[in-house]
């Protein structure tokens, strides 16, 4: 698997800024509420358990988490959650494919905001299905190096030995741990299996990953693509963005 891209670095640094002004908490609350529609008990709702894990990792207050669960499961006195998950697709400069997952209570508003942002940055919002075939849904589990004994780094040999027993098909060692990859349907078993083997599981999620990546002709074009991705990520309704821009 390719290493972390410049876009990944932008997302990580931006997440810190967002957390300071509450934007991350708002997004996480939306994700929890949507997941809670299938049941407010995280023990029987893996999607909800995943969303709660993300919220806890971001240090979201427990009261905020409980309110989001209540809203999604219909227990909130102010009414049930009206959010819906929608996928949008489009093209960035140079034909870069962009896939956007949004949580919104107003499809028309979200589509208009996305279209304006694409146009402003040299891209175009496309029709459903125009780029989805260029991606595949994957499982990713993030391991902490704190569970390693080899100088605070994940032992590749130990990880490989453990992965032979699980439904994993790839991994990547990173500075503060490792990322384990698997098929879309394997996420629940993969994170549980790694935890049972003694690894510290910091997080897990379903992601869209490009089947192939494309590069830009020059630095200016690449910068334009990165600016588009960052602008899209700043929209309130946008939950997650994937692209096939080469690292």
Swiss-Prot record:
Keyword Nucleus applies: no
Protein family per UniProt: Belongs to the TACO1 family.
Entry-linked InterPro entries: Integrase-like_N, TACO1_YebC-like_2nd/3rd_dom, TACO1_YebC_N, Transcrip_reg_TACO1-like, Transcrip_reg_TACO1-like_dom3, YebC-like
UniProt keywords, alphabetically: Cytoplasm, DNA-binding, Transcription, Transcription regulation
Primary location: cytoplasm
SUPFAM superfamilies in UniProt: YebC-like
Protein name: Probable transcriptional regulatory protein PMT_1423
NCBIfam families: PRK00110.1, PRK12378.1, YebC/PmpR family DNA-binding transcriptional regulator
One Pfam family hit: Transcrip_reg
KW rRNA-binding (keyword) present: no
A GO term, aspect molecular function: DNA binding
Domain of life: Bacteria
């Amino acid at each position: 698997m390719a290493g972390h891209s410049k876009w990944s670095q932008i997302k990580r640094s931006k997440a810190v800024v967002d957390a300071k002004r509450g934007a991350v908490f708002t997004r996480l609350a939306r994700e929890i509420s949507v997941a809670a529609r299938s049941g407010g008990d995280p023990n029987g709702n893996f999607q909800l358990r995943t969303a709660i894990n993300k919220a806890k990792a971001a240090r979201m207050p427990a009261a905020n988490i409980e309110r989001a669960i209540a809203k999604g499961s219909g227990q909130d006195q102010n009414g049930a959650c009206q959010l819906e998950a929608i996928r949008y697709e489009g093209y960035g400069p140079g034909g870069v494919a962009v896939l956007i997952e949004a949580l919104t209570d107003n499809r028309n508003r979200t589509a208009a905001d996305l279209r304006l942002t694409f146009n402003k940055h040299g891209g175009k919002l496309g029709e459903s299905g125009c780029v989805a075939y260029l991606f595949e849904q994957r499982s990713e589990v993030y391991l902490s190096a704190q569970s390693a004994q080899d100088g605070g780094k994940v032992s590749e040999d130990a990880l490989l030995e453990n992965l032979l027993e699980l439904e994993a098909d790839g991994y990547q060692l990173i500075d503060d741990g490792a990322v384990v990859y698997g098929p879309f349907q394997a996420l629940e078993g993969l994170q549980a299996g790694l935890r049972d083997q003694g690894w510290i599981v910091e997080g897990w999620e379903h992601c869209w990953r490009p089947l192939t990546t494309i590069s830009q002709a020059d630095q200016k074009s690449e910068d334009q693509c990165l600016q588009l991705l960052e602008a899209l990520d700043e929209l309130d309704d946008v939950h997650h963005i994937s692209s096939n821009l080469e690292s």
